[in-house]
Structures are given as C-alpha cells and as structure tokens.
C-alpha cells in the first residue's frame, strides 16, 4: 500500500460528497444518525463524546453548508478509522487532504478547515475499536466532476 507522509505525519485524503464519503480505499454513504445509546443491530457506528452515530444506513439531506451539524466531522472520523484499520494502526498523527466542490472552495475553505481541526487530539471508537488520532493539519482542495 502506498503511503504519503510528511516526516511522521500520515497524509489521508477524504472527499466529502453529499451522497458518499470517499477515501483512498473506501466509499460509504454520507449518513450519520445520532443516538444516546449503542445501536442494537448495527456494528457500523462511531462512539464519540458519549454519543453513538450509526453510519451509512440513512440518507443525509442536502445542506449547502457542510458545517451546519456534526455529521461530516463524524463521517471524517469513519474515513480515518477505515484507512488506519487497513494499515493495522489504532493511533496516528495525520494531515487531512479534503475535497470541496469548486463552487464552495472560496467561501467554505476556512470554515471547513476550522470545523475539521476543532479537536487536535481525537479519541473515538469505530466498529468497537478505539482510535486515538492527532489531526496535525488540513488542506482543502477544490474538486470538479467530469
């Protein structure tokens, strides 16, 4: 597996689409449904700050501003966990490379970056495995559909 690093920092790409979240090695539905209790039937969930988020089972309504709720933050954690799991890691220092639609790069770049960097150290569970991640930085890249 090819990896990109800046010194000891792993660079992870994540495209925050309205229908799907895409990383280098995974694609999943952009859906996170919050609950105060652990889900009974699904193992595809994130536990973060005493809340549970079931991933990929519903459909997220369109929001032009992706920072209007916590969903894209949680979905980013899922993308991180999936990439780390492929590498056999549970802890990592990472730099996010994220895609935003060209139409919104200029107006949302700074706010989306702050949204993703709001917690430098993030401790969460995904699929009943604990992860500890240091999000050292974030680069926003405009994306276009061909």
Regions found by a protein language model. Name each.
Residues 1-143:
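Nucleotide/phosphate-binding catalytic cleft detector across ATP-hydrolyzing
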